[in-house]
Curated annotation (Swiss-Prot):
The species this protein was found in: Plantago lanceolata (English plantain)
Gene: ycf3
Family affiliation: Belongs to the Ycf3 family.
The protein's name: Photosystem I assembly protein Ycf3
Topology of the protein relative to the lipid bilayer: Peripheral membrane protein
Subcellular location: Plastid, Chloroplast thylakoid membrane
Record keywords: Chloroplast, Membrane, Photosynthesis, Plastid, Repeat, Thylakoid, TPR repeat
Keyword Chloroplast: yes
Gene3D superfamilies in the cross-refs: Tetratricopeptide repeat domain
One GO process term, biological-process aspect: photosynthesis
Function summary: Essential for the assembly of the photosystem I (PSI) complex. May act as a chaperone-like factor to guide the assembly of the PSI subunits.
Amino acid sequence: MSRSRTNGNFIDKTFSIVANILLQIIPTTSGEKEAFTYYRDGMSAQSEGNYAEALQNYYEAMRLEMDPYDRSYILYNIGLIHTSNGEHTKALEYYFRALERNPFLPQAFNNMAVICHYRGEQAVREGDSEIAEAWFDQAAEYWKQAIALTPGNYIEAHNWLKITRRFE
């Protein structure tokens, strides 16, 4: 039985029902349907905190999915898992790969900025202000890109940019 059929989460069940209806209505190849099934099961596992299972599903979805736009969301979700696991270098790599395929993912820019800001704070704690400033500058660039894509979102980032005089 597919993982998504056993999930007790109402939102996931609703998403699965709608997704299954769309897969029946919209003309898609069997490979596209299979890729989406793996993606959907990956999201279900990820929402339950089963990251290893989610990654397996996402990697299988990546093997089958050919559309760059759809691949960008798979890569983004893989980045989220690496972020949650504290694997920031890997997370940045996957966010970057997602943005190569879809440059209109403000959430990827935001997550990259958060990681850079975190690394900047680590450098401050270690007494390396030069490295900290470089990380903060990089965070600022990513937040500017996220804000440019979705004006009105990322209010805290916008305020940080103003306070630190990094907003142009």
